[in-house]
Amino acid sequence: MNFADTNWLEAMFVHIDEERQRRVVVERFHRRHPGMIGLSHIVLLETRNIFSRITGSANPDEWQELQAGFSGRFYLDPMNWDLLRRESFRLFEKYSHQAAIGTFDTVVLASAILAGAERMLSFDENLKALAVAEGLEVFPELSKEGLAFLAKLKRRA
């Protein structure tokens, strides 16, 4: 299953000039890879906040459009908080001493792993590097920055 990060959803739904290049990447991906996109409640919480912040609207149309996708476009993993905490702690133990991993990135990845994700859809290089370190595919591919972060994650202490 493909699993989307907040910045992927932002590129899908928010029509601002700064996101145009990302939007083209997202649209091309979905034409080539149709099917459901996995989301977690963690991503959904951040997306709700970001959509209002970017649009300046208390209840943005983009949020309504995303919610309409729960009738077949998106799969919202029910998420078990105890399992999420356990998986996040596992990732912290494995990588926090290797590189400065973000707490939120780690929790997003933990939720993707628990949801059965095979591919992470994101524009965040650190999150994608962490996903690759855990055996997930990523799209778009890692940049030089992401590959450098991945090398830090793979160092042996």
Give, region by region, the residue ranges found by the protein language model.
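Acidic, metal-associated active-site segment
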Residues: T6, G102-R119, N126
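Short, well-structured N-terminal submotif of metal-dependent ribonuclease cores
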Residues: M1-I42, I54-E65, E134, F149-L150, ...
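Hydrophobic/aromatic ligand-binding patch that stacks against planar heteroaromatic rings
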Residues: F29, S111, L130
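Acidic catalytic patch
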Residues: S71-H97, T106
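Alpha-helix N-cap/helix-start capping motif
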Residues: N7, H41, D82, D124-E125
